[in-house]
């Protein structure tokens, strides 16, 4: 049995086992589908460099992981940092934002161990019709399938 990617999925890197794991993860997270990447770094870089478009706005916590920062840097979207876990500052920025708004946070911040206020973030995202993107890399496993699933908030997020 092959382990890991043997190349790009288009050419030779897709396998039945990969698709089984994706189906399993989608089921466990109660979402329509899941997509595996070779690492969390490539997942964040790929997402933020390709999904938000010119005219959109990405609002990211100032303590967000480097992989998100790198993906955001490659994006054509407008980029704004908000103070760490400061929901009032985030709301002030959302009021002035344009296009589709993406709020980027980590559920468990890798550098200092802080938790994102996920319930408050879901309410703010709903209020401003924003898309909340949660990096669960440091919570997955330690908190089961992550804090989003543990708090039963998975239907309010685009990416985990």
Feature names for model-found ranges:
Residues 2-39:
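Conserved N-terminal alpha-helix of the aminotransferase class I/II PLP-enzyme fold
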Residues 10-14, 66, 87-88, 108-112, ...:
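Short, small-residue-enriched loops and turns at beta-alpha junctions
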Residues 130-144:
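SF2 helicase catalytic motif II
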Residues 80, 84-134:
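Active-site phosphate-binding strand-loop segment of PLP-dependent enzymes
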Residues 129, 148-160:
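Conserved active-site segment immediately N-terminal to the catalytic lysine
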Residues 47-66:
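Conserved PLP-anchoring active-site segment centered on the Schiff-base-forming lysine
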Residues 54, 74-76, 128, 156:
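Short, structured coil segments at secondary-structure junctions
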């Amino acid at each position: 049995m092959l382990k890991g990617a043997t190349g790009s999925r288009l050419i030779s890197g897709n396998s039945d086992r990969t698709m089984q794991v994706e189906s399993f993860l989608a089921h466990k997270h109660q979402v329509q589908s899941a997509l595996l990447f070779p690492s969390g770094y490539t997942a964040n870089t790929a997402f933020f460099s390709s999904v938000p478009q010119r005219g959109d706005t990405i609002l990211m916590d100032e303590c967000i992981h480097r992989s998100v920062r790198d993906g955001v840097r490659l994006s054509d979207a407008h980029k704004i940092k908000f103070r760490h876990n400061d929901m009032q500052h985030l709301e002030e920025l959302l009021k002035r934002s344009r296009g589709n708004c993406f709020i980027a946070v980590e559920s468990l911040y890798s550098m200092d161990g802080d938790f994102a206020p996920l319930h408050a973030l879901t309410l703010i995202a709903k209020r401003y019709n924003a898309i909340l993107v949660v990096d669960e890399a440091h919570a997955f496993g330690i908190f089961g399938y992550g804090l989003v699933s543990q708090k039963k908030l998975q239907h309010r997020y685009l990416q985990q």
